[in-house]
Amino acid sequence: TPLTLIKGPLENIILKKQVDAETREDLNVMKQNTERLLNLTNQLLDFRKTESQGFRLNFAKCNVTEVLKETHVRFTSLAKQKGLEFTLQVPEKDFYAHVNREAFTKIISNLLNNGVKYAESYVHISLEVPEADDNNSFRIRTENDGVIIPNEMKEEIFKPFVRFNEKEDGKVTTGTGIGLALSRSLAELHQGTLAMGAGEENNTFC
């Protein structure tokens, strides 16, 4: 894409020794914004695919526990930067299910990104599996203690470009409002669901 063609030369310029500190800082900001735009473009394309009639995912047996651990590790540094307690709870035995690994990873990534972005002090993710031997039935639950999303917004936030935005103590969060819509569509393509819980003490997605 054109954004990818912009990102490459930017990275090359940043690596040059003769670039002064002020210019390098500006270039890094440009690179970060380019990456955000690239990520948004990819998410929009993915969302359009999931909404296309006849679109299907290919499923294969996947180590769900492994995906959760890997994704948790990817967000650990960002959570630490924000001073968050960032925990993962999984059964002792690895759990396998037939999923589309790439799509499943996107769902978890979006939920954790959302949690880390809005949380005040903690983000918790857990894997719940049935006692019966059912390799396609499980639940992922994420919780964060950000500003509580009101009941009237708990369905609205799953619509494209709808984002709950509340200023508190002068803090403003930014986002595109596409991640949750994409995650729900991908969950539904797995014959699953994605919704917000009714709890008032935290924001729960499962």
For each of these PLM feature ranges, what is it?
Residues 32-37:
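Short alpha-helical segment of the dimerization/phosphotransfer core of two-component systems
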Residues 14-21:
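Short acidic helix/loop segment immediately C-terminal to the autophosphorylated histidine
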Residues 149-161:
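Short conserved segment of the HATPase_c
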Residues 48-59:
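Helix-loop junction within the histidine kinase core
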Residues 174, 179, 183:
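Short alpha-helical Gxxx[C/S/T] motif in the catalytic ATP-binding
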Residues 58-63, 80, 85-95, 130:
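Conserved catalytic submotifs in the C-terminal HATPase_c
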